[in-house]
Structures are given as C-alpha cells and as structure tokens.
Design a protein with these regions (language model features):
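PLP-dependent enzyme catalytic core of the Aspartate aminotransferase-like
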Residues: 21-24, 222, 369-373, 378, ...
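N-terminal small-domain helix-loop-helix segment of the aminotransferase-like
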Residues: 25-105, 109-110, 121-139, 146
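Conserved PLP-binding catalytic core of the aspartate aminotransferase-like
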Residues: 329, 341-373
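Active-site phosphate-binding strand-loop segment of PLP-dependent enzymes
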Residues: 5, 180, 186-245
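Conserved PLP-anchoring active-site segment centered on the Schiff-base-forming lysine
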Residues: 150-171
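PLP-dependent aminotransferase class I/II
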Residues: 260-339, 344-347
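Short acidic capping loops at alpha-helix termini that bridge into adjacent secondary structure
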Residues: 105, 129-134, 155-157, 234, ...
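Short, Lys/Arg-enriched N-terminal segments with co-localized hydrophobic residues
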Residues: 12-25
Length: 410
C-alpha cells in the first residue's frame, strides 16, 4: 500500500476519530475511576476443553437433590420467576444457620451417616447460630465490598498481609483506603505481631483469609482468639473463611465472645456453587443489620429466586458436600506426597489448592507446560510468588493426569 494512498488516509482518519472519542470519555471519568486497578480472575476458557485446576472450583457437581429440587420448585411455583424474590432470603438464612449448627463450619471433618452430618468434637460451636446472624449476597466478593464500605474508613490505613486474597487491595483502592503491607514470615505464615501493631497504630480494623490464599496456611482458632484479645474491640475484625471446610478451624465459636468479629463464607468452593454466586456473613445481629443497610442502599434484591432455592437445597444436603470435601482433602494429601517424592517444593495446605514450585523451572514455564497438556493452573506474575503456580485439587483422575505431566517437567 502506498504511504499516501486513500485507504491509508482513511484508516488514519478513523484511528484519530477513535482516539478523540476515547479522550472525550476519559475526560468524563472521575479521579476515582482513573485510579482503579481491577481484580484479574483466573482463566475461564469458553471452549471448556481444558481440565480447570486454576480457579479453586469444586471438581464435583452439585448434589442430585439440588438439580431435582430446583426443577420441581420451578414447575410447581413458576411465579417464583415472574415475581421478585424474597429480598432478605429468609428461608436460605434458616438453612445456612441449620447447616452451620450441624457441621461446625468444617465439612471435611464431619461424620457422615445415612445422609446426616455431625461436627467433630473440636468443631462444635457451643451455641446456636440463628438466621439473624446471617447475611447473604451475590458471592463473597459482593459481600466483601459491602463490608469494606460499612467498616473500613479512608481516614485509616488498612493493614494487609503481603500475600492475601487479591480483591482486598482492589476494594481498598475502590474506596480510597490506603494500605500498609506486612511481609510474610519465613515460613509463609502471617506476621501476627506486626499486623496487630500496625493496625493499632493506624486505628483500623483487620481483614485476612483463614486459611490464607494463595498460600493455603491456616491459623488455629486459638491464635485468632489471641489476635482478637489484642485488637481494638471497637474496630471490625474480619475473617474470610472461603476455604475453611477443607481443614481449617472455623472461628464461628468465637462469635459468642467477640462482638466485633465478622466471618465471610462462600458456596463457591466446598458447596460446588461457584456458578450460583452466593456468599454470606456470620456475625452478631447488629453487624448484620449494618451490612443490610448498605445492601438496601444499592440493591434491594441481590439474590435471585433460583440462587435462593439452590442454596437452601445445598445446605439441606451437607452430607453430600462433606463427602466431596473429604475426597478433596484425601487427594490433596496424596498430591503433597507426590510433590515431596518428585523434588517439588510446596507450602503445606489446609485448602483445596496447593502453591508449588519447581526448583529448576520458572513458574511461568511450569504453567505453560501444564497448559500445553490440557490442564489450566494459576500463575501469579507477582514478586515473591512468581516462581510458583497454584494448583486446585481435582478428582483422582484429574490429579493422576496432572502428576504424569509434572513428572516430565525438569
């Protein structure tokens, strides 16, 4: 094409018009919008030809009772789709409270007998969780955004661990909250004393994931209790228990003694409900009321009817998800033994994923080699963990295939 051809001039004209439109739109944006750094989720391939071990989803499907019950409910009551849903998800909250009372908040340690579950002795809550102590929302991400809005002030700097759920700094930026980042200890655990010291100095509340993501390390309930005892009782203390069902110790029993404790949980991991977008809070009724006020100021009907029905049925069949969680924990332990025996470094996990490193191959290359063989894992291009990949625990068949691939990575 000649450098002065009409076609080239036309393309240049179109490009300039496009840039002008972008510039005009940018001039409309607030300074808040210009400074946003959005969360980057794991790959979600549209063709679904990959085995997905990159987003910490449950490899097992929802229980049969959920699928059958959903069809029956909609067939018998089609108006549930034509009318607005219950804005407070009351039946779902009752089901969540009942499930927590029956399981203690750790499915993988429950006893299962004839479709009934009971908590291990160490996981018994010791008091009754009531529906008034539950808040439900569109996934724990929306729930967390409301928590940030309600309890973390831009006047106070928020303390975050160096490696944590990457949506926390995103929300901090969204709400104009400065952050202090505390490096992990040499064993990848949280530097509790440093976190508490900075939080006290900054006059802020606290938030952290337990078990932690992406490291998989879990703090004991006793250690969390000690943190609460040293924290300001007038500041919110948020524990994100997204992965607790796979072997952590739930902090739900601590709610009786600490009125500033707020626990966030999700249906996306242990309850095979990532596609539902259903998360919830367990806390004292006054805190629940405050988060509800935020919800009602933004979206009075956050949970659709199908999600409410599905969540309720899932809770009523906790026995099934407890069995799935036990299988995932068993595969995790088997995978960690494989890593030890084949020269891979890993951080011992209490979640449904493991953070692993090959001593002689970069994290990016490990990710690429595994992907070339039809499996997706997660690589973080982040200083400190860029040599690692995070691998979700799948079914035995999926993990056996992964092991064969990893044996060849030298």
């Amino acid at each position: 094409m000649h450098k002065n051809s009409p076609e080239k001039k036309y393309r240049l004209k179109i490009l300039l018009l496009h840039l002008k439109k972008i510039t005009k739109i940018m001039s409309m944006l607030t300074s808040r919008m210009k400074n946003l750094h959005p969360y980057i989720p794991g790959e979600q391939p549209k063709d679904r030809v990959y085995i997905k071990l990159n987003a910490n989803e449950n490899p097992y499907p929802p229980c049969k009772e959920l699928l059958d019950g959903l069809k029956k409910e909609i067939s018998n009551f089609p108006s549930k789709l034509s009318l607005y849903p219950d804005p407070d998800s009351n039946e779902l909250k009752k089901a969540i409270a009942k499930m927590l009372n029956e399981t203690g908040g750790v499915l993988s340690r429950c006893s299962v007998s004839q479709k009934n579950v009971s908590p291990s002795e160490s996981d018994k809550i010791g008091f009754e969780i009531t529906p008034e102590m539950i808040y439900t929302g569109n996934g724990s991400d929306e729930v967390l955004s409301f928590v940030f809005y309600a309890f973390f002030d831009s006047k106070n700097t928020l303390v975050l661990p160096e490696f944590t759920y990457s949506f926390y700094p995103v929300y901090a930026g969204f709400y104009g909250i400065e952050t202090d980042i505390v490096p992990m200890k040499n064993d990848w655990s949280l530097d509790i004393e440093k976190i508490l010291s900075l939080a006290k100095k900054n006059g802020s509340g606290l938030i952290f994931a337990n078990p932690n993501a992406p490291t998989g390390i879990s703090l004991s309930r006793l250690n969390v209790r000690k943190m609460l005892e040293k924290s300001d009782p007038d500041k919110i203390f948020v524990v994100d228990e997204a992965y607790c069902d796979f072997g952590g110790e739930s902090c739900i029993p601590l709610l009786k003694d600490f009125k500033n404790l707020l626990i966030v949980r999700t249906f996306s991991k242990s309850l095979s409900g990532a596609g539902l977008r259903l998360g919830y809070i367990v806390s004292n009724p006054e805190i629940i009321s405050s988060v509800t006020t935020v919800k009602n100021s933004l979206n009075h009907f956050p949970l659709d009817a199908l999600t409410q029905i599905s969540g309720k049925i899932a809770c009523e069949n906790a026995w099934y998800y407890a069995e799935c969680a036990k299988k995932i924990v068993s595969e995790r332990e088997s995978f960690q033994k494989f890593l030890e025996g084949n020269g891979w470094f890993y951080i011992p996990s209490k979640t449904n994923f493991v953070l692993v490193k090959n001593p002689s191959v970069s994290g990016k290359e490990v990710y690429t080699k595994i992907k070339e063989n039809g499996i997706l894992v997660r690589h973080f291009d982040t200083n400190g963990i860029s040599d690692y990949v995070r691998i979700t625990i799948g079914t035995k068949e999926q993990m056996d295939k992964l092991k064969e691939i990893m044996k060849k990575i030298k």
